[in-house]
């Protein structure tokens, strides 16, 4: 999962405006992980999908693929939520 930091710290109070963290622009979470077997990758995808469904207010768009790589498989998945707050909740729930 990737998280981009766009926050700019205020020099007067060492704080950050919430609008710089949640600006509504990043509603997607990308997952790229390696597993020994396709069954392991499918189990994780099922768990992530369930978490996404529990987080969504409007349907989350989920795209995924499992590709064979040397010594295993790679899970590539994209979860696009209706708002950035849901994407952040999903990311935090998977840490």
From Swiss-Prot:
Xref: Pfam families: DUF406
Cystine connections: none
InterPro entries with a match to the protein in the record: DUF406, UPF0234-like_C
Residue ranges crossing the lipid bilayer per the database entry: none
One Gene Ontology cellular component annotation held by this UniProt entry: cytosol
Family listed: Belongs to the UPF0381 family.
Protein name, per record: UPF0381 protein HI_0400
